[in-house]
Design a protein with these regions (language model features):
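Conserved RecA-like ASCE ATPase "motif II neighborhood" in helicase/translocase motors
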Residues: 1-34
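Non-catalytic, compositionally simple segments
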Residues: 25-146
């Protein structure tokens, strides 16, 4: 479970998947890192969710030497080069070809909502914002009448 309280009192390595999208990442990490006193390892894995979030801050802290973490960046192109599409073809019983691989990759980028979303999802490049949406009703409710 991804509830911070569920980690309390446990031992062992922790993997936090899609960390950038976790609502209580700070509390989850606090509980997870407490396990490191017993030698546990904590792996924080995620697609980016903009630049303004705790996941991206941890990446920056590691890159700038403020934390003793290592950053591993794997783009879609890296995964393809390591055989991702070949594996997909094998598992789904489809024939592999360089042309099919290129068409598959190009289709993922082409069908993303926009270039920034594709770059974030497949290229490990965070968007300038997380894309939070405020409804018109919420905005109008906060406006001061003129």
């Amino acid at each position: 479970s991804s509830r911070p309280s569920n980690l309390r009192g446990l031992q062992g390595d922790v993997v936090i998947d899609e960390a950038a999208f976790h609502e209580a990442l700070d509390e989850l990490l606090k509980a997870a890192f407490a396990l490191t006193m017993w030698g546990a390892r904590v792996r924080i894995i995620s697609t980016h969710n903009g630049v303004d979030n705790l996941f991206n801050q941890y990446i920056q802290d590691a890159r700038e030497g403020r934390k003793d973490y290592s950053v591993h960046r794997i783009t879609l192109d890296d995964a393809i080069a390591d055989g991702l599409y070949r594996r997909i073809c094998y598992v789904t019983n489809q024939p592999w070809s360089p042309e099919a691989e290129k068409a598959w990759r190009d289709g993922l980028y082409r069908n993303a909502p926009n270039k920034e979303s594709a770059d974030e999802e497949y290229g490990c490049i965070p968007k300038k914002s997380g894309g939070a949406y405020l409804s018109r009703v919420l905005i109008e409710a906060a406006m001061t009448p003129v």
